[in-house]
């Protein structure tokens, strides 16, 4: 017996605003059922001595230490601005 129905597939497609045909719904139902069957096989694995992880790969931060440094002087930055006003970049208005 299938663990997921064609109606459920059509409902999810409708929620995602996807237009699918009856043939596609049947195909997706079979594919999703196969995925669920495979996932259920994972429940049979003995994980007693396996430590819990949040990632498959050993994840660690490889970034450098964040060290604040002084930025460029305002005058030097603004000399590249096509337009400025009161020490700020002036950009075209986008709201009325």
Swiss-Prot record:
UniProt-listed Pfam families: GatC (PF02686)
Enzyme Commission number(s): 6.3.5.-
Positions of disulphide bridges: none
Keyword Isomerase: no
Keywords of the record: ATP-binding, Ligase, Nucleotide-binding, Protein biosynthesis
Swiss-Prot/TrEMBL catalytic activity: L-glutamyl-tRNA(Gln) + L-glutamine + ATP + H2O = L-glutaminyl-tRNA(Gln) + L-glutamate + ADP + phosphate + H(+); L-aspartyl-tRNA(Asn) + L-glutamine + ATP + H2O = L-asparaginyl-tRNA(Asn) + L-glutamate + ADP + phosphate + 2 H(+)
Enzyme class: ligase
InterPro entries: Asp/Glu-ADT_sf_sub_c (IPR036113), GatC (IPR003837)
GO biological process, one term: translation
Gene Ontology molecular function: asparaginyl-tRNA synthase (glutamine-hydrolyzing) activity; ATP binding; glutaminyl-tRNA synthase (glutamine-hydrolyzing) activity
Gene3D superfamilies: Glu-tRNAGln amidotransferase C subunit, N-terminal domain
Signal sequence extent: none
Function: Allows the formation of correctly charged Asn-tRNA(Asn) or Gln-tRNA(Gln) through the transamidation of misacylated Asp-tRNA(Asn) or Glu-tRNA(Gln) in organisms which lack either or both of asparaginyl-tRNA or glutaminyl-tRNA synthetases. The reaction takes place in the presence of glutamine and ATP through an activated phospho-Asp-tRNA(Asn) or phospho-Glu-tRNA(Gln).
Quaternary structure (record): Heterotrimer of A, B and C subunits.
Similarity comment: family membership: Belongs to the GatC family.
Protein name, entry field: Aspartyl/glutamyl-tRNA(Asn/Gln) amidotransferase subunit C
Source organism: Geobacillus kaustophilus (strain HTA426)
Gene that specifies this protein: gatC
